[in-house]
Each structure stands twice: as C-alpha cells, then as structure tokens.
C-alpha cells in the first residue's frame, strides 16, 4: 500500500474512532416474557377441512416474528371455545407474562378471549394480520374469507374488554407478510415489554433526602411501586462507606485505568472552577465507583436515586459528592442513577435505557436564541453510550449549588433525532409522561465539566419551552437518542398513565 493510501485509511479509522466512542457493556441483557395466543371458532374446523392447519401456519409466522425482537415467546396455541380459553389461564399466569399478543387468525367469539382480560394483569395487544392484501374477488370462497377474517371480531373483543373495565392496550392491523408498518408496531410493543419486564421486577435504592427545597422532587415511594411495580429500597450512606473506607487496592487501580481509557482529560479552557483532572480526584472517583459497585451488588439493586451532603470535611462528604464518574459508568451499563434524590427521573431513565435509547440525566440550561436551541444537560449522571465523541473528565473546584468538589463529566450527545421525557405528578397524585421529540445539533458547549447538548424542538425554542413548562413536568428529564414518542405512548397505555407529547400537533 502506498504511503498516501495508508495515510488516508489511517485518517478514516481515526475519524470513525472519534465519531463512535467506546460503549459501556450492559450489565444484564434485555428480555421480556411475551405470550402469544391465537383465537378462532371451533365450528369452522368441522366445516372447513384444512382450515385449522392453515391457522396454525399463520400463527407460526407471527410467533417467529415476535421472537426476532429479543423476547422470550410462550405460545398457548389456539383458543377456539370458552372452555379452552379458561383452561389456558393457569399456564398463562405461570408464564409471568409482561405482554400478551392475541393473534386474530380468523373470526372468534369474544368468549375465547374474555377470560384473559379478566384474569391477567399484563397488557393485551390484539393483532389482526391477514395473509392476503385483498381477496381475489372473482375466485373468492368462504374458506378464503375465513383465512383473511383477522379483523372481523376485533370490535367485539375491544368492546367486551371495555365493559370489563380493562381495555386492550392496542390493536395492530395489517398484512401478515411484507408490512413494514405492522412490523414496526410489533417491534415497539416488544420494546415496551422490555421496559415492563424490568420495571416490575426492579429494586431501586433511595438514599438521603431531597435537595433543600426542591418541591418537585418529592414523591411517594408507595405510589411509584403501585404504578410501576418496582420496589423502593431505602438505603443509607453508611452502607457504602465501609467499601470506600477499606478499598481493595487492585480494584481501585483497575478502575482508574478503566476511567482513563474511557475519558479524555483535557486542560481547562475558560471556567476558573475547572482544572485538568487531578490525581486526587481520579483516586477519589475510582474509590467511590468501586464502593458503589460493591454496594449495589450487596443490596441487589437495579437503580439508585440519592442526595446527601454529610459533614463538611468528613469522609462521608467526600464519598457522597464523588459518585458522578461511577454513576455515569453504571447508568451507561443499564443501572440508572439519579442525583438530587429524583426517584421519578430514575424511573424515567430506566424506561429509556430499556427502550435501548440511552437515558441521560438532564435539565434545561441557557437558551441559544441565535441558534433557536436550548442547552440540555446536567452535572451528572450521564449515559455515556449516547455521547457524540469520547467524553471528558474535568476536576471541579466546587459543584455549583451544592457542596463538594471532584471530577465532573462533560460531553454532548450524538447529533440527530432525540427524545426526552419528564415523569410529572398531577394534583391527584397520579403520574404523567411529558414527552418531546427534537434534534441534537452540532455546536459549541461550555467547558464546565457538565454535559450540554444543543436541542432544537419545534416549532421554535420559545413556544416549545412554554408548552413544555405548562404541562407541569419535573425540572429533570431523561434524554435519549432517536424519536420514540410512539413507544412511550404505548407504555403509557399499558400502565394507565396520561401521556402528552408537546411537540405533536405543532
């Protein structure tokens, strides 16, 4: 290879490396328990020889399609009479389902479905995917009609579910093959199943107290458990301190190497509160990160919201104010951590992570009226897997608005579509998803040791921020890549949570 060609290849490789920073490996794989039951009418099998076998073939196509989306599928066969429907309930309950697809392979009476609505606690999605895009009218037969009668009983089923007081979560309508829109709906529901699977099994730690006097942070842990299914485990700083006070030297050295391999540590630029990462701040960050990992393993946690100050100059103050690096690594690995005691946003970040779209801790920073953008970011924690390039660590001589000093994380998220969601609380105590879709734009960010991204939201920054604020959000929100309001609306239906997308109908 000539020198010029080699130089070109090297330049391209370097550019790719900068554009695609190393990813933090997920601690646990995404999964969900998804059931599929087909429905039909046993009278047809006697009248139309071969129809039952054709129904099984249709069901098999759909089940394989669901399996392709990273979920564990349990098939319950065809429910074709009231007795068969009732007999399936024990198996469905033992499968611990996160979601049930009801495959409407042909017309079925609602008695083949009603027991599922009455007995199961998971969301139910009706799927009507007919094999032919239309009947061959000149050569049509009753057999062919029944083979394509997937939608026929959908209104009957949805009406009965409403009368039971438990409406179905959704109806997917389309063609069995070659229908990208229907396939996307199925994919989205499997993503929602990932969220539901982990939410209702999660143990989220809660430590300390609300940062004085952020009223919007206050939330009832019982309401969180009732709505999302997760258990809120109450924790204390003294549970982490033994791991910090007596660290394993080899673990700390390995963590320091991991941190330095993952982050850049540039010289300070314009902010006098920042300096190049010091050896002391690296040591403290590594010790705190190791202590955090041992603590969450001991308590068997899946997320952690915290705020604590401790006595000035104490080891406790040093520990609890230096979680930022460790919690960013954990958040990126699928373990959401939320500062300022924001349990609601910890749930929002878990939702985004299980949708596999990131889930950075964020709030609004100054508006850029010249670019028609608003800076979105925070002082930690952050989902490093959605960074636009290698993230930066800076030593901060003090944290603005709170005690302590230490390493701070700085980066912008990837350019392109973004989604954000705040988990708000209404006056009646119920939760509300407040969602927006926008764009992450390239642009300079302040070198302050905090994350910042230029976010542009329609129709313009002033109108968007006013509409967002009037929906009553928590001032924190989860920030992710891609446009995913559709999945969040589905999740809202599954959980019975009001969902408002402020950038819709703009």
Predicted segments, located by residue:
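Cap/lid and interdomain-hinge subdomains that line or gate substrate/regulatory clefts
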Residues: 30-34, 70-73, 133-270
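Periplasmic-binding protein-like
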Residues: 97-106, 125-127, 301-307
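Extended hydrophobic packing segments that form well-structured cores
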Residues: 401-506
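Long, internal scaffold/assembly segments composed of regular secondary structure
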Residues: 256-349, 353-354
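Short catalytic helix/loop segments, enriched in acidic residues and glycine
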Residues: 51-67
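Short, acidic/small-residue loops that bind anionic groups at enzyme active sites
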Residues: 115-140, 145-153, 327-340
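Short, well-structured alpha-helical segments in soluble
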Residues: 85-97, 114-116, 289-298
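C-terminal catalytic subdomain
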Residues: 328-448
